[in-house]
């Protein structure tokens, strides 16, 4: 038998009490950053079946951008999936984090804008992430990527 206290705790933590739209609006405020870091960025898309999955590429230098798009990549890559438990957040909310990671690590950062629940039930967000990883590993996102130099 579950105690009244435990029932109250479970009720408070249930998904029914999460205000998704309010949470998403608060997350959107994170992008209002006057100290935004300027790195080279490129928005592209990959496909999960018929669905286009937006992906943002962060290049630590102009040289990295040129190499990854035209000549063939020589930089290590970090494949990044933003937080939010498949329900909140976005690539835009993590823009500053990814830009700083690119600069601090001298890696190309690949950030995936996967679809969110509850509109898109699991495993749809995971499948969007897999589609981006597959495109990266098969050189569809960045030319001549060495799979041994990709960190997920």
Give residue ranges: language-model regions:
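A glycine/proline-hinged amphipathic helix-loop "lid/cap" segment
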Residues: 1-63
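Short beta-strand element of the alpha/beta-hydrolase
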Residues: 55, 73-84
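Short beta-to-alpha linker loops that shape the active-site pocket of alpha/beta-hydrolase fold enzymes
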Residues: 61, 113-117
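Intrinsically disordered, low-complexity Ser/Thr- and acidic-rich flexible linkers and loops
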Residues: 63-72
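Serine-hydrolase catalytic-loop signature spanning alpha/beta hydrolases and amidase-signature enzymes
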Residues: 80, 85-88, 92-93, 109, ...
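Short amphipathic alpha-helix adjacent to the substrate-entry channel of hydrolases
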Residues: 91-111
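Alpha/beta-hydrolase active-site loop
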Residues: 120-142
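Alpha/beta-hydrolase fold nucleophile elbow
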Residues: 143-152
């Amino acid at each position: 038998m579950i105690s009244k206290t435990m029932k109250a705790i479970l009720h408070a933590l249930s998904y029914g009490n999460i205000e998704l739209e309010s949470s998403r609006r608060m997350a959107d405020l994170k992008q209002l950053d006057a100290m935004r870091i300027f790195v080279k960025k490129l928005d592209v898309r990959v496909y999960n079946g018929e669905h286009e999955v937006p992906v943002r590429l962060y290049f630590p230098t102009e040289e990295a951008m040129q190499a990854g798009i035209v000549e063939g990549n020589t930089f290590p890559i970090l494949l990044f999936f933003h937080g939010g438990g498949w329900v909140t957040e976005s690539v835009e909310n993590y823009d500053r984090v990814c830009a700083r990671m690119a600069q601090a690590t001298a890696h190309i950062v690949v950030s995936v804008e996967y679809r969110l629940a509850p509109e898109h039930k699991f495993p749809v967000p995971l499948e969007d992430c897999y589609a981006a990883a597959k495109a990266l590993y098969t050189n569809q996102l960045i030319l001549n990527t060495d799979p041994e130099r990709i960190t997920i």
